[in-house]
Amino acid sequence: MTTIVSVRRGNQVVVGGDGQVSLGNTVMKGNARKVHRLYNNQVIAGFAGGTADAFTLLERFEAKLQAHQGNLERAAVELAKDWRTDRSLRRLEALLAVADKNSSYIITGNGDVVRPENDLMAIGSGGYFAQSAAIALLENTDLDAKTIVEKALAIAGNICVFTNETHTIECIDFSDEITTESKK
């Protein structure tokens, strides 16, 4: 279980996630990296769900991005098509949250592709907590996207036992600056 949250505001899109890997009620690892850059650093993907399943989907999504020259929407739709038709994929229990400088999508375990309202995405066991925090911060502050993601992850980590305080945060600045941050 995990928390992944993405916020788009101003000239940035930011995706952040915690680092906890749990097996049942036991914490197995505290510094896993669940947010990755893909396609020449132009796409950020975060995953939630079973680790092996999530990595399988991430690899397949990256292959779709390569096949479609980084077209995020096309890659997401093609992965969803595969997900629905490939028996081995249908058994995978994972979610992907993907974003580039133009759009954001959640790819669900049912093979659905959802473009979230207001380009705010949150998935995983702490997703609802992070989403609620991010909505409140977006509507009531002028904080930048990165700060909102940091605060939303911190709030989710204080509520959800399957989310920790070790975060990986990736940012695409539309002026083409790339920022990566891991912190505890």
Swiss-Prot record:
Main subcellular localisation: cytoplasm
Active-site residues, as the UniProt record annotates them: 2
Catalytic activity: ATP-dependent cleavage of peptide bonds with broad specificity
Residues binding Na(+), per UniProt: 157, 160, 163
Any one of the GO BP annotations: proteolysis involved in protein catabolic process
GO molecular function terms listed in the Swiss-Prot or TrEMBL record: metal ion binding; threonine-type endopeptidase activity
Documented activity regulation: Allosterically activated by HslU binding.
Localisation per UniProt entry: Cytoplasm
InterPro entries per UniProt: ATP-dep_Prtase_HsIV_su, Ntn_hydrolases_N, Proteasome_sua/b, Proteasome_suB-type
One GO cellular component, as annotated: HslUV protease complex
Enzyme Commission identifier(s): 3.4.25.2
Leading EC class: hydrolase
Organism domain of life: Bacteria
Keywords: Allosteric enzyme, Cytoplasm, Hydrolase, Metal-binding, Protease, Sodium, Threonine protease
PANTHER family attached to this UniProt entry: ATP-DEPENDENT PROTEASE SUBUNIT HSLV, METALLOPROTEASE TLDD
Function (record text): Protease subunit of a proteasome-like degradation complex believed to be a general protein degrading machinery.
Family: Belongs to the peptidase T1B family. HslV subfamily.
Subunit relationships: A double ring-shaped homohexamer of HslV is capped on each side by a ring-shaped HslU homohexamer. The assembly of the HslU/HslV complex is dependent on binding of ATP.
Name of the protein: ATP-dependent protease subunit HslV
Lineage, broadest ranks: Bacteria, Pseudomonadati, Pseudomonadota, Gammaproteobacteria, Alteromonadales
Gene from which the chain derives: hslV
